[in-house]
């Protein structure tokens, strides 16, 4: 029987099991199965996945993120805010501004601290990737995919594809509560046009500075929030002429609000909370 200490944290209800790999050890070959086991709501701790906080050669810390089906993702906006909180409060970093390595590249985090506790984290998510090759999706590699039609159940849905280090398909609807989240979501996620699958967001524009947001996450299904998805939604809204670049946009997710801005210099900034739920020790056994 093996075990490791963990901290369960959430960003707007998007919860992960966080493991400090400066102190703990999980064999590389076991990571996918351990993520699946620990995320199980009935037989594990229950979460949207597992995130490892690891040493890095190029930044103070590195984030590795696993979905609850065991697949490894390249980035996670809510996860990055929680990693920033954990790293500062556990003295893995000293400054309130620092970098975090991800499989999608290096991002910059800035934490707001009150009485030694991080109350807010802002992440510079970098520039969005907009070509088919970067997302990735099938088709002519250097072309963008903006407001293209997809036929489902005799209804045409127009979506825009954006990568924030992971792929997103953003669909504008009149009412997110009536959106086909659990039906169209998995169909698009696994469609052959996306070789690495895709996260699917349904967006309802409220005004020039606010939107409602619901998400079907690749490898996890319906979640309360998706930070990279919120960034992609704002980028897609600007590309479609629905919002103005440079303004801070309030994104109302099922789990709460994020503040997102696609600044003129090119990068996308995300600001929001990160919360600790509990600490514990998880025991597991990998069958031979």
From Swiss-Prot:
UniProt binding sites for substrate: 14, 67, 77-78, 166, 199, 217-218, 227-228
One Pfam family per UniProt: DAP_epimerase
Protein location: Cytoplasm
Catalytic reactions of this protein: (2S,6S)-2,6-diaminopimelate = meso-2,6-diaminopimelate
Enzyme class: isomerase
GO biological process: lysine biosynthetic process via diaminopimelate
Residues marked Could be important to modulate the pK values of the two catalytic cysteine residues (site): 168, 217
Signal peptide interval: none
UniProt pathway annotation: Amino-acid biosynthesis; L-lysine biosynthesis via DAP pathway; DL-2,6-diaminopimelate from LL-2,6-diaminopimelate: step 1/1
InterPro entries to which the protein is assigned, alphabetical: DAP_epimerase_AS, DAP_epimerase_DapF
Keywords per UniProt: Amino-acid biosynthesis, Cytoplasm, Isomerase, Lysine biosynthesis
E.C. numbers: 5.1.1.7
Active site: 76 (proton donor), 226 (proton acceptor)
Keyword Amino-acid biosynthesis: yes
GO molecular function: diaminopimelate epimerase activity
Quaternary state and interactors: Homodimer.
Role: Catalyzes the stereoinversion of LL-2,6-diaminopimelate (L,L-DAP) to meso-diaminopimelate (meso-DAP), a precursor of L-lysine and an essential component of the bacterial peptidoglycan.
HAMAP family assigned: DAP_epimerase
Family: Belongs to the diaminopimelate epimerase family.
Protein name: Diaminopimelate epimerase
Organism: Bacillus cereus (strain AH820)
């Amino acid at each position: 029987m093996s075990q490791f200490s963990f901290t369960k944290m959430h960003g707007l209800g998007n919860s992960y099991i966080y493991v400090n790999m400066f102190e703990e050890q999980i064999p590389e070959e076991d990571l996918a199965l351990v993520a699946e086991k620990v995320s199980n709501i009935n037989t594990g701790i229950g979460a949207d996945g597992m995130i490892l906080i690891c040493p890095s050669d190029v930044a103070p810390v590195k984030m590795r993120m696993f979905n609850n089906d065991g697949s490894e993702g390249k980035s996670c906006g809510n996860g990055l805010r929680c990693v920033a909180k954990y790293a500062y409060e556990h003295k893995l970093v000293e400054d309130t501004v620092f970098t975090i390595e991800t499989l999608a590249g290096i991002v910059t985090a800035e934490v707001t601290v009150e009485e030694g506790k991080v109350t807010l984290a802002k992440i510079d998510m970098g520039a969005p990737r907009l070509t088919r090759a970067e997302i990735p999706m099938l088709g002519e590699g250097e072309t963008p995919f903006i407001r293209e039609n997809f036929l489902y159940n005799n209804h045409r849905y127009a979506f825009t594809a954006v990568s924030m280090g992971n792929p997103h398909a953003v669909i504008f609807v009149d009412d997110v509560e009536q959106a086909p989240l659990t039906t169209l979501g998995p169909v698009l996620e696994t469609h052959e046009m996306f070789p690495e699958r895709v996260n699917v967001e349904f967006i309802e524009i409220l005004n020039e500075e606010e939107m409602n947001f619901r998400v079907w996450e690749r490898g996890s299904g319906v979640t309360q929030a998706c930070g990279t998805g919120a960034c992609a939604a704002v980028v897609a809204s600007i590309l479609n002429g629905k919002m103005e670049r440079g303004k801070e946009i309030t994104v109302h997710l099922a789990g709460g609000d994020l503040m997102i801005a696609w600044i003129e210099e090119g990068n996308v900034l995300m600001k929001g909370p990160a919360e600790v739920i509990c600490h514990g020790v998880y025991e597991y056994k990998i069958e031979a």
